[in-house]
């Protein structure tokens, strides 16, 4: 663990995972309240949250399979793109609250964004394989949880201060891009190759 923590790759993974989970939970925790605030019924908002999990299952399986063919970085980038699209759809829904945009948000978040989980362990294993993998991945998970906690908290604080979720969703979308770049910089493909 001590050797891993002294590498750039470890810290790029940490940045990628923290930023990715920030976006994930910023959206997941606030989307239902947000959808109700902008005019969707409580039933539709709850349906959207449940549907995200439903479409996540084939997305995770498909993206996990795809990662074995095209590489982990590509699949991580696809997952991050899912959260970018999700955040943009959420922002657009405030002005155009249509079922189509709701379906785009649900599909992008679930089928693409939730695919991040299909490669988290594999990315870390490709860079830090061996007997210390568990302690390295566990440490990264502790850092990741920080991003998962900060996302909902900061998004809620921004909403409370401004009365809008827009800035919070822009931040989440931006951090999704940061996450994708960080995983490319960690470069598991160079270890795998």
Predicted regions and their residues:
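C-terminal ends and interior cores of transmembrane alpha-helices
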Residues: 82-95
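A membrane-interface helix-boundary motif in multi-pass transporters
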Residues: 157-174
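Helix-to-loop junctions at the C-terminal end of transmembrane segments
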Residues: 60-71, 159
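Cytoplasmic membrane-interface "Motif A"-like loop-to-helix N-cap segments
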Residues: 69-80
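Loop-to-transmembrane helix entry/capping segments in MFS-fold secondary transporters
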Residues: 42-43, 130-139
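Hydrophobic core of transmembrane alpha-helices in multi-pass small-molecule transporters
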Residues: 18, 100-115
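Intracellular juxtamembrane helix-capping segments at the cytosolic ends
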Residues: 115-128
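Extracytoplasmic gate region of multi-pass secondary transporters
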Residues: 5-63, 151, 155
């Amino acid at each position: 663990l001590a050797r891993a923590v002294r590498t750039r790759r470890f810290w790029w993974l940490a940045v990628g995972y923290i930023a990715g989970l920030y976006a994930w939970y910023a959206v997941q925790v606030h989307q239902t309240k947000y959808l109700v605030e902008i005019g969707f019924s409580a039933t539709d908002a709850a349906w959207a949250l449940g549907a995200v999990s439903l479409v996540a299952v084939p997305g995770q399986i498909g993206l996990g399979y795809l990662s074995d063919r095209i590489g982990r970085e590509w699949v991580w980038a696809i997952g991050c793109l899912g959260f970018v699209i999700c955040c943009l759809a959420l922002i657009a829904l405030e002005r155009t609250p249509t079922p189509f945009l709701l379906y785009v948000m649900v599909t992008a978040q679930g089928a693409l964004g939730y695919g991040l989980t299909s490669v988290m362990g594999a990315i870390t294993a490709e860079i830090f394989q061996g007997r210390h993998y568990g302690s390295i991945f566990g440490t990264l998970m502790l850092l990741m949880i920080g991003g998962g906690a900060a996302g909902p908290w900061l998004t809620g604080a921004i909403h409370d201060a401004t009365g809008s979720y827009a800035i919070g969703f822009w931040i989440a979308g931006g951090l999704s891009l940061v996450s994708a770049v960080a995983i490319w910089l960690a470069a598991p493909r160079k270890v795998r190759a």
